[in-house]
A protein has these predicted regions:
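PLP-dependent aspartate aminotransferase-fold enzymes
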Residues: 1-54, 74, 187
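Conserved PLP phosphate-binding loop immediately N-terminal to the Schiff-base lysine helix
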Residues: 59-73, 88-113
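Active-site PLP attachment segment
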Residues: 112-147, 159-164
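Helix C-cap/helix->beta junction micro-motif
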Residues: 82-86
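A glycine- and small-aliphatic-rich helix-loop capping segment at beta-alpha/alpha-beta transitions
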Residues: 4-15, 73-78, 105-119, 140-146
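Short glycine/serine- and small hydrophobic-enriched flexible loop segments
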Residues: 168-173
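Conserved PLP-dependent catalytic core of the aminotransferase class-I/II
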Residues: 176-195
């Protein structure tokens, strides 16, 4: 339609409510998105206190916390550099962003991220399963794969053949034309929101 999109920020209260359990903990350090100096300061603070940073988590295009805000190449590059230097893992949560933001699955395939090193782990789901089937995918770097304990990981959400068929069908539909369409529709949507 020609009508502008209506949207609500009703999820923000619930988002912050559930994060409240992490406030005040000294073993969780948060950094504002794309604040490279803040990220460097967080790693320096951890080192100063003798804390080992197990992992850094990033969402390439935010969903619930600040919908649509994207991680910059400079911030990602700093995170990759710092995690590697401090022996921490870099985990990218592409559950919502994969395919839907830039027409590609991985953050390292986003425009401006070409040539940057891959994260240690990256998760995908909703774009692969049409948001309908219980399917999540975990991509691992060689380093992370070597740390991952081998064994049987079974639960309700694993090894769903139909969900795998859905993911294969989705990936078979991803053509250069579809990727361009995703990017063009995204730009169009942003222009309409800005009016």
């Amino acid at each position: 339609t020609d009508r502008p999109a209506q949207f609500s920020d009703s999820s923000r209260k619930a988002y912050h409510q559930h994060l409240a359990t992490f406030r005040g903990l000294d073993n969780l350090i948060t950094v504002a998105p794309n604040d490279v100096e803040g990220l460097r300061a967080a790693f320096a603070q951890a080192e100063e206190h003798g804390w080992f940073s197990e992992a850094t988590f990033l969402e390439p295009v935010m969903g619930e916390g600040n919908p649509g805000m994207g991680t910059t190449p400079a911030f990602y590059a700093a995170a990759r550099e710092l995690t590697r230097a401090h022996g921490a893992l870099l985990l990218i949560d592409s559950i919502q962003a994969g395919l839907r933001a830039h027409g590609v699955l991985s953050i390292i395939d986003y425009p401006g991220f070409e040539g940057l090193d891959a994260p240690d782990m990256e998760t995908y789901s909703k774009a692969l399963n049409a948001g309908q089937f219980p399917l999540s995918v975990l991509a691992l770097s060689t380093r992370a794969a070597e740390l991952y304990r081998k064994g049987l990981y079974g639960n309700t959400m694993t090894a769903n053949p139909r969900a795998m068929e859905v993911a294969v069908a989705v990936l078979e539909q991803v053509t250069p034309a579809m990727r361009r369409n995703i990017v063009e529709r995204g730009r169009e949507f942003l222009q309409r929101l800005e009016k």
